[in-house]
């Protein structure tokens, strides 16, 4: 009897988890773009070698109360066409996913994304969204007020946060476009491939810059702008990379 009950519970749990997963067919193409808006809580995103955007939600059941039978939920930002509190719109090669839940409620979403898509994320300060991304091979553009953590990415990157820390580890670097990483009151920690050829713009007002790259032999190429602002050509120079914070430190590390 005990074994039967356990099996029944496992079956029911599997059904619930399946019902909370939503797939968006797409292509694993660098021409494709995913836009995410208004997500709250932690937002982990993982790139993979597949063609579907897979969104899993572990948030509480969104089924309307019995009193709402025959009625549909109404949201100011769109229509829940997924069953997990999201509005999905497709235009050409761009897919836009908007979280419809109020900012007081964490969505508890996890995403798996085709690794070659570019990703754009916007999240207001009221949404307390900590974003973590790994294993993507295209452009990432994030505007938030909270923490950003990227691992095994190539860029280009355009990252902006107000009060969060930014942590980036590159696998390799796409130099087709310039990159920009900025925080107002957070620290920035970036690990670059050791042979990266880039023109760096480093800026901090009340913080400091720390690095294990050897600046001494080419110090003559470093231009001091004022305060702790510097322009520096690394490995002969290349694509433009702006890294700036107002009140935090900058850590620039050697990777593989």
Spans of features found by a protein language model:
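Tandem repeat domain/solenoid detector
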Residues: 156, 165, 182, 187-191, ...
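Beta-strand-rich extracellular passenger or scaffold domains
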Residues: 121-122, 128-131, 167-168, 189-191, ...
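Acidic (Asp/Glu) and glycine-rich low-complexity loops/linkers
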Residues: 20-126, 132-143, 158, 175, ...
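Hydrophobic lipid-interacting interfaces of membrane-associated proteins
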Residues: 60, 129-131, 164, 186, ...
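Short helix-loop boundary/capping segments
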Residues: 153, 157-160, 169-182, 196
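Extended lipid/amphipathic-ligand handling interfaces
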Residues: 41-43, 170, 248
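Bacterial Sec-dependent N-terminal signal peptides
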Residues: 1-24
């Amino acid at each position: 009897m005990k074994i039967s009950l356990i099996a029944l519970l496992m079956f029911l749990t599997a059904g619930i988890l399946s019902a909370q997963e939503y797939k968006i067919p797409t292509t694993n193409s660098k021409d494709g773009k995913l836009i995410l808006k208004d997500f709250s809580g932690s937002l982990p995103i993982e790139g993979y070698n597949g063609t579907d955007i897979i969104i899993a939600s572990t948030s509480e059941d969104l089924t309307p109360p019995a009193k709402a039978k025959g009625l549909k939920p109404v949201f100011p930002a769109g229509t829940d066409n997924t069953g997990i509190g999201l509005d999905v719109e497709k235009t050409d090669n761009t897919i836009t996913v908007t979280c419809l839940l109020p900012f007081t409620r964490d969505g508890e979403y996890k995403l798996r994304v085709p690794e070659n898509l570019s990703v754009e994320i916007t999240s207001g300060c009221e949404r307390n969204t900590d974003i973590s991304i790994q294993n993507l091979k295209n452009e990432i553009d994030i505007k938030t007020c909270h923490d950003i953590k990227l691992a095994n990415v190539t860029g280009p990157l355009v990252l902006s946060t107000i009060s969060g820390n930014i942590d980036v580890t590159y696998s390799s670097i796409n130099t087709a476009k310039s990159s920009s990483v900025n925080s107002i009151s957070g620290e920035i920690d970036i690990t670059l491939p050791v042979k990266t050829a880039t023109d760096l713009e480093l800026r901090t007002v009340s913080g400091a810059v720390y690095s294990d790259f050897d600046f001494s032999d080419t110090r003559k190429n470093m231009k001091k702008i004022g305060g702790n602002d510097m322009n520096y050509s690394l490995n002969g120079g290349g694509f433009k990379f702006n890294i700036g914070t107002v009140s935090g430190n900058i850590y620039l590390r050697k990777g593989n």
